Amino acid sequence: MNIDDKLEGLFLKCGGIDEMQSSRAMVVMGGVSGQSAVSGELQESVLQDRSLPHQEILAADEVLQESEMRQQDMISHDELMVHEETVKNDEEQMDTHERLPQGLQYALNVPISVKQEITFTDVSEQLMRDKKQVREPVDLQKKKKRKQRSPAKILTINEDGSLGLKTPKSHVCEHCNAAFRTNYHLQRHVFIHTGEKPFQCSQCDMRFIQKYLLQRHEKIHTGEKPFRCDECGMRFIQKYHMERHKRTHSGEKPYQCEYCLQYFSRTDRVLKHKRMCHENHDKKLNRCAIKGGLLTSEEDSGFSTSPKDNSLPKKKRQKTEKKSSGMDKESVLDKSDLKKDKNDYLPLYSSSTKVKDEYMVAEYAVEMPHSSVGGSHLEDASGEIHPPKLVLKKINSKRSLKQPLEQSQTISPLSSYEDSKVSKYAFELVDKQALLDSEGSADIDQVDNLQEGPSKPVHSSTNYDDAMQFLKKKRYLQAASNNSREYALNVGTIASQPSVTQAAVASVIDESTTASILDSQALNVEIKSNHDKNVIPDEVLQTLLDHYSHKPNGQHEISFSVADTEVTSSISINSSDVPEVTQSENVGSSSQASSSDKANMLQEYSKFLQQALDRTSQNDAYLNSPSLNFVTDNQTLPNPPAFSSIDKQVYAAMPINSFRSGMNSPLRTTPDKSHFGLIVGDSQHPFPFSGDETNHASATSTADFLDQVTSQKKAEAQPVHQAYQMSSFEQPFRAPYHGSRAGIATQFSTANGQVNLRGPGTSAEFSEFPLVNVNDNRAGMTSSPDATTGQTFG
């Protein structure tokens, strides 16, 4: 067999079954014969590479030719048309070969021959495929004809036994495009979309779309149950109900759950089982997956607690491994482990919002490590962590406060925290006898540190209301127990008013500041802290504030005296003359010898104020509550009181802004004087009360007022008061106050028991008070016991 025959057999294999019947295929073979030498050599080399003998290939070619010749009559016209198109494509390829140079033809012929040989993996398999392809065409044509056939009518058997033709589904619904065979079925279907129910029950007015539904419903009213169970005799309206019931007797369970492969006898039970078991289980799995995703995301973000995990013992690490089930044990911590590891230090977080979200203020506080470990720990961490951060630790309520306050000096870097963040937590300033005794002269530095960072609470309570109730009761319990410190600042409002607390503490501790002027909020804090310790009655102080809180701005001194011959005491308690006893006692330098004298002096001063208020309240026009009760039986204080600071800060510095000019009061004087400064001269010169204005409509003369006060005093019991002279106060403590309050003290001049008052302001400064007239060029106003020479203050 020559090369042309071989090429002819190969192209027949590639072309298909019907290639032998095409005349164009023979033409192609003839056209290619000019190149037979080159292509034949290439194909022979490929065949030799595949180790296939020439005899087997030739035998296969002969078998294919014979089988194709036997089937030439069965080839359809369509297949011949497809074959012609393939031949045209082959011709185009050959034309490209002829046009290309000789060098490119070799390159193009090599892959063509390879592709041809790849299709023939095995000769025996190829023969079997060819035999199947010979049988397939006729069968495929028959199947295609059956699918494509759509007969116009279908032969049916009617109810009477006659034959009939049935038309296909030509009626289509406009709403859902459903097709029906008859218009009746279509109209019945349309009722579903329109909601129309033409069939109505005559007994219960229920309506139905179809007539058979109505008939089945009417059986309920008639009680007819045509379907009966053979085993138990139960009857049913529907046949489906009877068949479902029979499965209970037979034990048949045809419905299976697709999740757990359990079998059930009814479909509703399968649905109920899926809802109860598998759907809830899937939800739980989804939740677990979400939690697991969150945990892994925390691991990826680097939010680990490795210092905590490395300190865990072996048993606790095993417990965390069991609970995490394969997760990283450095990222998952159990809550029980956190409760047990109270002695371990929590990790240092860079943001304070973590502290806000994670920890309760009532259970956590600032605490430094113990001296044995904390020193090296802080030194090592100081070079790595910038800036220094809080070390938080959970406080056990049963533990006592073991650490002294000298560690608070090491917490000075806490000033880097913002006030707005620190003010979210309410802390209490430490006031304990043992802690204060251990400090000594370092009291001032400690309070400075306490201003920067909140200290540890004395008691650890889980309820904030209980803590506040304890603070309210504590003021009565600590009245006579604290001898070392004058001011117990139980400030519960440090969170809302941090600046007020700092100002109050600074005014108590600072030695250089002799007369610090505080705002009204700071004064409120001072009043609470002072009268709790000094056992001065709350009613007295409250009445003093209420009585003189409606004075105009700028009052620095109010000079008044009681026209009483029995009151022989020359009490001159001015804000500039009060010794600085409390400040010296705050730093531990007070003397216990003069404490009893000062206590008696302040007790006498309290009684003096009460008597003055009793007299003025009877004649004052704007005291609307005549039933004011004042406690006069003050107990002797075991510790030196601090009324001097009250006189200094409250009565000399509180601004009063509500003056009512329409009311008459014998105690109102020039509006530029302060609240209380009892400037009383020598004992033999009693001074009268003088009014600050002359009301021409209803004015009370000074003589009438003095006569009234004198008559009332003679009728009353005459108490004996101890005389205190100016020389009784220590001179070293007077000097700072005279120096600092020089601007206020220059307004007064005392000569022979008479007080001269000069107001720096004019009537223009108080234009809202028409009855007040103060001129700069008028002479000094003199207050004397003589009613004829006494002038009213205006």
Curated annotation (Swiss-Prot):
Involved in transcriptional regulation. Represses the transcription of a number of genes including gastrin, stromelysin and enolase. Binds to the G-rich box in the enhancer region of these genes. Residues 321-336 have a biased composition (Basic and acidic residues). One of its GO terms (cellular component) is nucleus. It comes from Mus musculus (Mouse). The keyword Zinc applies. The modification Phosphothreonine is found at residue 194. Pfam families: zf-C2H2. It is found in: Nucleus. GO terms for biological process: gamete generation; negative regulation of gene expression; positive regulation of transcription by RNA polymerase II. Sumoylated with SUMO2. Desumoylated by SENP3, resulting in the stimulation of transcription of its target genes. A zinc finger (C2H2-type) spans 171-193, 199-221, 227-249, 255-278. GO terms for molecular function: DNA-binding transcription factor activity; DNA-binding transcription repressor activity, RNA polymerase II-specific; RNA polymerase II cis-regulatory region sequence-specific DNA binding; zinc ion binding. This is Zinc finger protein 148. Strong expression detected in brain, lung, liver and kidney, with lower levels detected in spleen, skeletal muscle, testis and heart. Keywords: Acetylation, DNA-binding, Isopeptide bond, Metal-binding, Nucleus, Phosphoprotein, Repeat, Repressor, Transcription, Transcription regulation, Ubl conjugation, Zinc, Zinc-finger. Interacts with HNRNPDL. Interacts with the 5FMC complex; the interaction requires association with CHTOP. Interacts with CAVIN1. Its main location: nucleus. The modification N6-acetyllysine is found at residue 607. The gene is Znf148. There is a cross-link at residues 6, 88, 115, 132, 291, 308, 356, 402, 421, 424 (Glycyl lysine isopeptide (Lys-Gly) (interchain with G-Cter in SUMO2)).
